[in-house]
Amino acid sequence: MKKTAICTMGTRGDVQPYIFLSKELIKNGYEVTLGSHPCWRALVEDAGIHFEPIGPDIDIEKEAAAIRGAVSNPALSMLKTMNFVFRIIQESTTEVYEACKGKDLIIVSHSQMGAVEAGVLGIPTVNVTLQTEMIGEKLRPQTFKDKVIGGMIAKQVAKPYNKIRKVYGQKPVKSADEIMSDRLNLIPISRYVVERNPYWEEKNVLTGYWYDEETEYVPDEKLAEFIASGDKPVILALGAMSFEDRSEKEKLDMFVNAFKKTGSRAIIQGFQKTMRDYVLPETMMACGSVPHSWLFRQGKFVIHHCGFGTSAATLVYGIPSVPVPHVLDQLGFAMQLNNVNVATKPLKAKDLSEETIIAKIKEMHDSYDEMKKNAEMISERIKTEGGVGEAVRLINELIT
């Protein structure tokens, strides 16, 4: 039996793709260890995967909310969040090293977590990349200017990993590319959503999205009754962006009032602190953790933050989107949805108001039939790719 380890940091959306991959690997005879923040133990173990706690015992989504709440600029917010996560990765290297020991393969997550440790241990690696913008165009002819600017950026990106390399007496690298697998980089995105860049090296493979149907889920009686009692509701699912550092009644009011004024029924996920003493009208209800594979099929469209996982779920389950990106990478995923005409143009978080939300709901209604048709068509195509199965097939080819 082949033994593999995956270590990842971040919110649930950063962990979920690796749960899907781990489950498929286990089905194919692998022994898998998935390491992450201690707060994700139940999520991972409930999926039948061996869990290893990595890093401090913190609520990562609340920590991310505190950082986000202090900065309004999406690029700066993303940079501060990345610095926070990189600091945890550096401080957790001993735990990552222990999780990697004795394994036949290390699957290096999108934060490059485990890459240095695998190199020290002499264990082969496979990479996973969620943002295609992070993949170098190695086959593109480079001008002198390209080389100079690229070298400067690469040096900055490599800094956190060189700090880890120093712990093990390793020489610094000039680029994070030097610690990536030279054989396989898995990109869990559909070729029907993003075209393969002709300047990528052959090792970079668009597998299709990784997902799980979660067919065993049964909603509670209250949620089932609400779904059955009227028109399909709007789903408000801001993911980790609705985890509040403090009560955000003003933001929730914007959405609730916009739903009232547009005559929209709605299901609202998140806003736990605000919801404790918040009274919703009968046309709306709050729900906790419900699988997107079930919830999104019940909705008319989704208003969401465009994290990787939620964006993928809207495409997999064939539902249009109103994107509300909060940080820079989310803006990129929002543009992917808009480019294939399954979403309105993004409504940036800094521009949120009752009026702008109403305008986006009206924009969605005006083009809904076309967007819904496109979403369902792409969903059918995605299902022909068998993304997570393709990923495991490629891994098998590599190590057998």
In which residue ranges do the predicted regions lie?
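N-terminal subdomain of nucleotide-sugar transferases
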Residues: M1-E52
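Conserved nucleotide-sugar phosphate-binding/catalytic loop shared by glycosyltransferases and other
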Residues: T33-M78
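Short, polar loop motifs at secondary-structure junctions
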Residues: S36-R41, S109-G114, S190-V193, Q269-R276
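Conserved nucleotide-sugar donor-interacting segment of glycosyltransferase catalytic cores
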Residues: F86-K155, Y192
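A donor-sugar binding/catalytic signature common to diverse glycosyltransferases
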Residues: L105-S109, C287-Q336
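A short, active-site helix/loop in glycosyltransferases that binds the activated sugar's phosphate group
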Residues: Q156-E202
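Donor-nucleotide binding loops and adjacent catalytic segments primarily
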Residues: E195-F301
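Conserved donor-nucleotide binding/catalytic region of nucleotide-linked donor-dependent transferases
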Residues: T344, A349-K350, E354-E355, K360-I378, ...
